[in-house]
Regions:
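C-terminal catalytic subdomain
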Residues: 438-439, 445-454, 458, 463-468, ...
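Short, flexible/disordered intra-domain loops and linkers
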Residues: 236, 351-362
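Long amphipathic alpha-helix in the N-terminal Rossmann-like dinucleotide-binding domain
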Residues: 47-48, 89-93, 100-101, 111-126, ...
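Short, well-ordered beta-strand elements within core beta-sheets of diverse protein domains
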Residues: 78-83, 97-104, 180, 199, ...
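C-terminal segments
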Residues: 1-63, 91, 143, 147-170, ...
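Short, structured beta/alpha segment
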Residues: 1-134, 412, 432, 453-454, ...
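Rossmann-like NAD(P) dinucleotide-binding subdomain of oxidoreductase/dehydrogenase enzymes
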Residues: 166-323
Length: 553
């Protein structure tokens, strides 16, 4: 008998499965705030404000120890929110108990429970937006979209793909083999057996969007999860976990299928969990160094690490619109997106456009002007840049000075009229030569390198080598040469890097759409997993077949 919540959400699940196969645009969660209830913004803001300087309830029970150190990048003051601090072994013990029940919960029941939790989260999108804004530094609109509709899309995608994979084979059948004068009949069962307890490690810049794919993939496949958020960005994922636990409680299922494990910067606990023998699965977003350590633990590990994203600018229909697109992509959230471009490779002889040949200096001039026009715009500038999440981001960039190149645009003095104390920085633009090593490392945050190359072939060679050795989540190319376009596609795809060609207008390299785009390929050093393909799901469980002779039935 189907769970009532499965029946309630079956139509949506069916639509999501179809969308996965068709790869067309699909979302049950519109991304614009105006699509939601009038008054939702005020209610969400009020709900967020009420939680400031309080203990966050709803993510654990019976705990008296509380910690928290979140700071708003806009206010430059602490939020004062405290979260329950629990002993790791006790958390794992509770996860083990919950696993024994959850793994035996039917596939349909799991799907219904999980989709219902997303519908509950939907009612808190505005609160989530303010929580995200004041922990990550994203603008309000980006916070609303990334932690609300877009995160829900990714979670639903994981549920749908999980449901599909779990039903790949029949649950039970009678297998008959003709043997001449008689038939051999066996009863066979096929069980997707979950691996156990998963650890989902969040990041400080996208605390829900990057967390929910692994979390919901774990839960859908019968595993339980411990979520270890970044200590500076806890509240957004705490809201989601609260709703998940509420739905479980209402349906007489263990709330501890998902638990929040918090720590501080000075007293981290991630390694305690990661190295524990009961942790079987790890999902991680963050630096390559820590990601490499996690992968070395020899557990089932799904990583999104750092990479060096590049653009090759060989020719373009319109240089101005091209540079405007690049400037926005590099400025969005001050370059703190894993999909943001860092390097632009340009032939030293310039590029062809519909208006004729543009020399290298003209390309630089158009790019810097586009960047300056965007970030100094009184409305577009602050909303595009957002705020810097971590002080160290600016410290690391400032420490590099001119990066050994020629600075053609310094960081500009940008202010946000709504938040006078906001930590804001526009991208610095630096020109380098192709022989320099500087651009071959990731510099997280507001910096953009323009690399002067001998020709387009050297540019492509450098980009390919970078993707293969350092990893790349995105790659963008501008060319009017169809043969060269094909060559770029073949060369970059051979190192498992996707390419976005000739983006302009509202199409930006930063954006990956759920149900259509794969986020990270899993084939280069930027990460070993992809949101959301079959491999992202079916490594979380093992197919086990049992056989029964008729007289044992």
């Amino acid at each position: 008998m189907s769970h009532p919540l499965f029946k309630k959400h079956q139509a949506l699940l069916d639509q999501a499965i179809i969308a996965l196969k068709e790869r067309k645009f699909f979302t049950p969660y519109p991304e614009h705030p105006k699509a939601y209830e009038e008054g939702g913004n005020e209610e969400g803001k009020a709900s967020f404000s009420k939680k400031l300087n309080t203990n966050y309830l709803g993510v654990a029970e019976g705990n008296s120890d509380w910690i928290g150190e979140e700071i708003s990048p806009y206010w430059q003051t602490g939020l004062g929110i405290q979260y329950p601090k629990e002993n790791p072994q006790e958390v794992i013990n509770k996860a083990k108990s919950a696993f024994e029940i959850w793994k035996n919960t039917s596939i349909k029941s799991r799907a219904g429970i999980l989709i219902e939790s997303l519908e509950r989260v939907k009612s808190r999108f505005f609160e989530l937006a303010y929580a995200t804004m004041h922990t990550t530094g994203q603008s309000f609109l980006m916070s609303f979209q990334a932690s609300g509709p877009h995160a829900n899309d990714r979670a639903l995608e994981a549920i749908a793909k999980g449901y599909e994979e779990l039903l790949e084979y029949p649950e039970e059948l009678t297998w008959t083999k003709p043997m001449g004068k008689f038939d051999l009949a066996l009863k066979k069962t096929f069980k997707p057996v979950p691996k156990g307890i998963g650890l989902v490690i969040g990041c400080s810049t996208f605390p829900t969007w990057n967390t929910v794919p692994g979390l919901f993939a774990n839960l859908m496949t019968g595993n339980v999860s411990i979520v270890k958020p970044h200590p500076k960005a806890i509240m957004p994922i705490a809201i989601l976990i609260e709703e998940l636990r509420n739905v479980c409680k209402e349906n007489k299922l263990p709330e501890d299928i998902v638990q929040l494990a918090v720590d501080t910067v000075k007293e981290p606990i991630t390694k305690i969990y990661a190295e524990h023998s009961e942790i079987k699965l790890i999902d991680y977003t963050g630096s390559s160094s820590f990601g490499d350590y996690l992968e070395g633990l020899q557990k089932t590990c799904f990583t999104e690490k750092s990479g060096v994203n590049s653009i090759i600018l060989e020719s373009a229909q319109d240089l101005k619109s091209t540079c405007q697109n690049i400037a926005f992509s590099a400025s969005l959230y001050s370059g703190q997106m894993c999909t943001a471009p860092q390097n632009i490779f340009v032939p030293e002889t310039g590029i062809e456009t519909k208006e004729g040949k543009m020399n290298f200096e003209e390309v630089l001039s158009t790019l810097t002007q586009s960047m300056e026009n965007l970030v100094t715009h009184p409305k577009m500038g602050p909303g595009t840049l957002g705020a810097i999440q971590n002080d160290n981001t600016l410290v690391n960039i400032d420490a590099q000075g001119d990066f050994g190149g020629k600075v053609i645009l310094e960081q500009l003095n940008i202010s946000n009229p709504e938040f006078a104390s906001a930590r804001i920085a526009s991208p610095k633009i630096v020109v380098l030569n192709a022989t320099q090593a500087t651009y071959q490392e990731e510099f997280f945050g507001p910096v953009l390198f323009v690399i002067k190359c001998k020709n387009k072939l050297e540019a492509l060679q450098k980009i390919k080598e970078l993707a293969e050795s350092k990893g790349a989540i995105t790659c963008s190319a501008y060319t009017l040469d169809e043969a060269f376009e094909k060559k770029i596609e073949e060369e970059m795809n051979s190192v498992f890097t996707p390419v976005s060609f000739n983006f302009s207008g509202p199409a930006f390299i930063n954006q990956h759409a759920a149900f259509s785009d794969f986020h990270v390929t899993g084939g280069n050093p930027a990460g070993n997993a992809s949101f959301t393909n079959s491999n992202f799901i079916n490594r979380r469980f093992v197919w086990v077949g049992n056989r029964y002779m008729p007289n044992t039935l």
